[in-house]
C-alpha cells in the first residue's frame, strides 16, 4: 500500500487547499484510506477533511469542491496498492495459450475487483478477502464484471483450477442480495459446462437475480501443449448454446422484463444463424464481451452512410478481417455498393497463422 502523494493536479482542489507532494494521505472524513476505491468513494463529497502525515508530523486539511470532482491527488500507482494477481489455473485460460517471447504485459493475469469496477476488467472473486467483499457491499461498488463459468461448485472449482473457488459463488449470491450490479460471462467449453450444466448455471443466476450474463465460446490457440484437452464450439454446439440461452432469456423477459442472458456474436456466426435484431441487446449492455458488436457496427455504418451523397466516389479500399467476420463485412460492403454505385472496395479474409486458425474473430 502506498498513499504517499507523488504529484498534485494543477488548479485542483487539493492544490488550492495547500496540500503538498510527499505527504501521506491517512484519512478522508474519518475513513482510513487503503486504496483507490477508498480515495474515490470518500473523496466524492463536497467537503473532504483529509488527515495527512509527513516526517512524523500529522495535520488536518479541509478541502471544499464540487461534489464528485476529484481532489487532484496522484499516487505511486493507479490502485495505490499492488494489483491482485490471478490465483486460478483456468482450464481455458487464454494467457496460458499465448505464444512465447511476446511483450511482458500480455502474460499478466490480473484478478482485481477494483480494476473490474474502475476499468471493466473481469474478476473471478476467488482471491477476494472478506474485508474486500464487505466493502463492495458497504460502499455499494457497482457495477463489477464477474467471470462465472458454472454454478455447480465442483465444476466451478475444476474449471478455475482452484480448490477454493467455491467461495466466489457465495460472494456472487451475497452481492446479488445486496443489489450489486454484476455483468457476468460464461466461457462455454464443450463437454464441460454446456448442456445440462449450462442450464443449471442459467437457472441459478436467474434465481439469484444476477444482472446480466454473456455466453462466449472458448478460445483455443495452437499453443496448448501440456494443457487440458479442450475442443472448440462448432456449429451444432453453438446452436444448442443459443437455444438454451433463448429458453432462459424468454423466461426472464416474461418474469422480469430483461432477457438477462446474451450470446456473443461469435456463437451466431459459428451456428450459421442470423444475428438478432437490435432490441435483443437491450442497449448493448454486454458489448465489451463481443455481444452485439456486429449489429451495432451495422447500425452505425448505415446511419453514417446516409449522411453522404450517393454519387460520392471514395478511393478504392480493402478491408482485412478475420475469417469469422468476413461474410458480415462483405454484407456491409454490398449495402454500401447499393447506395454508392461508384464505390470500389473488397473484403479480404485473413487466416490467423500467428496464433491459430481457430482464433478467427477480428
PLM regions and their residue ranges:
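Hard-cation-handling environments
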Residues: 239-321, 339
